[in-house]
Design a protein with these regions (language model features):
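Membrane-embedded alpha-helical bundles that constitute the cytochrome b-like, heme-associated redox core
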Residues: 1-204
């Protein structure tokens, strides 16, 4: 792959990780967070999506979610497998964040694929994607743990990826601005993690 082409692919990968994939994750966690209000609140909130015509909803899912997500995931695996880690020689915070970003990315490919199978695929087969479905999914302690790790991996990957996005796109160039966005990304991670974990525990 030529350097110019790889540069463009990496920029596209970075952009799609924030828009629309990152925005969708924040929306998805916010929607699931309604589960803390109980079964009716959750079902009413998620049921609003059913008001969108099926063909339009399907088109939106593929264009806004699935296609960008698959590109970001598969190209991300390529980056993870070909990237050079400096953690053996340098114990800096950013080098460890770099390594964790790649590790969580690979894990999320497995987690997201399984989550889609348990929800969207089952819906296509006639199952109802509602509060009770999630209760049944996390009824197994191992599956609950798997989902918690998946949620934390996703929120970290987004928060740290947001920092990388701002740097790679030249938005934060000075050490001070990068330090500030480090704190912002930590805040994003904590807030989204609390929402995500609280949501999944609401089904227990």
């Amino acid at each position: 792959m030529s350097k110019d082409r790889e540069f463009l692919w990496r920029r596209l990968h970075s952009l799609l990780g924030v828009v629309p994939v990152g925005l969708f994750l924040a929306f998805h966690l916010s929607l699931n967070f309604t589960a803390v209000g109980g079964e009716k609140v959750y079902n009413d909130a998620t049921g609003l999506m059913e008001l969108v015509p099926h063909s339009l909803l399907l088109l939106m899912e593929w264009v806004i979610i699935y296609i960008p997500l698959m590109f970001h995931a598969f190209y991300g695996v390529y980056i993870a497998l070909t990237a050079t880690h400096n953690t053996k020689n340098f114990s800096t915070f950013r080098n460890w964040m770099f390594k964790l970003q790649r590790f969580t990315g690979i894990f999320l490919v497995i987690f997201v694929a399984w989550h889609v199978f348990q929800t969207r695929v089952q819906k296509a087969l006639g199952a109802d994607v509602d509060f009770n479905m999630m209760v049944e999914i996390v009824d197994n302690p191992w599956m609950l743990g798997f989902y918690i790790v998946g949620i934390l991996s996703a929120t970290f990957h987004l928060a740290n990826g947001l920092w990388s996005f701002l740097v790679s796109w030249g938005i934060t160039q000075s050490p001070k601005s990068q330090q500030i966005t480090t704190y912002i990304s930590m805040f994003v991670f904590v807030v989204l993690s609390i929402m995500g974990v609280a949501a999944i525990l609401a089904f227990v």
